[in-house]
Amino acid sequence: MSSPSPLPVEDPPGGRRAVAVWSIGVAVYFVAVIFRTSLGVAGLDAADRFHVNASALSAFSLLQLLVYAGMQIPVGLMVDRLGTKKVLTLGAVLFTAGQLGFALSPSYGMALAARALLGCGDAMTFISVLRLGTRWFPARRAPLMAQLAGLVGMAGNLVSTLVLAPVLHGAGWVAAFAGSAVAGLVVLVPLVLFLRDHPEGYGPPPREREQVREHGKGAGAGGGFVRRQITASWREPGTRLGLWVHFTTQFPAMVFLLLWGMPFLVEAQGLSRTTAGGLLTLVVASNMALGLVYGQLVGRRQSARLPLALGTVGLTASLWAAVLVHPGDRAPMWLLVTLCLVLGTCGPASMIGFDFARPANPAERQGTASGITNMGGFLATMTTLLAVGVLLDATGDNYRIAFSTVFVLEALGVSRILRLRGRALARERELRAPAPVPAGSAVAAEPARAATG
């Protein structure tokens, strides 16, 4: 017998209040992304300030992302158990403290600790925003709301490039990072005063609330709840497919924007910082433009999910290969521009991972399933950030060899996607099949059999 459909019986209505509450959540996420990506425009400055080489520099982003990825499942469990508001509030406090600490750190070790704290707070934002979208808007809007959240996140990246970089180079390190930390305090006010987990009358169903209460009783009950949530989510092939889609699509752009894009464009391609910053901005602008397109396509046609994801991977690999094997020391500007435009597809494609995990899990597991999925891209990003730094040190700053690690992880991810897609799609069709008709209904029995095949 198949499991009951995880889709809610009655969708929340959406509307203006939903938009207002959701906007508070994405504002917190927006600030978190500014803080997360601020090192991307300050990589060379950080190397000078703390007197570190490429491997040590990559450790900043690596540690931040290690904490972020490691927190995804715990955060998903926290969202499922405590609700969105509490988790978002804690996250905002932590990432604000981390950004301020990074501004004032006098040593490399203290700066690393500050980035870890920032990563911990940052980890609590995106899954919470996804949960707000599913609690406040109809299910048919879920792909679009997820893409909109990703778009707002990329806008935060844009602020890092267009606003923080000039302030950093004009006013200095402390003014740029400490000044930006004020934004964290600003978003805390509406978060604490006005954000609600769900609309009135659309809270968790009684069965879900009872399960949470029961799981919280008795010694070791918390551990049992954690195991049940993780095991049940991971058992669904849609969750695993979502993780690998996220893993394979997101990391090429993340590596470029978070740390290695600016050094690659300046040191390997001979561009000025201004021109390199413009190309980083182009990645973000492309992402924002394409996010809505991907969201509309997936929302209207679920069958477009895998072609979009795999097509994005193929296009990204092709452009990176063209840049890295181009004859001569430097690729032409038109090719670098094309690469940056294509890297803008990585973020929207990574959101497709959540569109596989979401229908595979009931409401009470959405946070956990989203956390598992969201680990994928950040694990790939961490691996590539470290590999590029190590290879740059080992090869005397040979960016062609260092960036070839992109192809290894893309090949791994594609192989896993192809292996899981059949089982995930079959399970999704099973969950969406009509519920069995009661045995006494002879008239309705035949249509029910026809519908289920």
Please provide the spans of the model-predicted regions.
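Juxtamembrane intracellular "pre-TM" segments in multi-pass secondary transporters
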Residues: 6-15, 198-243, 434-440, 444-449
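Cytoplasmic helix-loop-helix junction between adjacent transmembrane helices
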Residues: 114-153
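Cytoplasmic membrane-interface "Motif A"-like loop-to-helix N-cap segments
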Residues: 81-91, 299-314
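Helix-loop-helix hairpin linking two adjacent transmembrane segments in secondary transporters
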Residues: 148-202
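Extracytoplasmic gate region of multi-pass secondary transporters
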Residues: 39-40, 236-291, 384-385, 389
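Helix-to-loop junctions at the C-terminal end of transmembrane segments
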Residues: 71-83, 290-304
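Conserved MFS/SLC helix-loop-helix module at the cytosolic interface between two early adjacent transmembrane helices
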Residues: 70-109
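Helix-breaking motifs and short loop linkers at transmembrane-helix boundaries and internal kinks
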Residues: 51, 83, 104-110, 121, ...
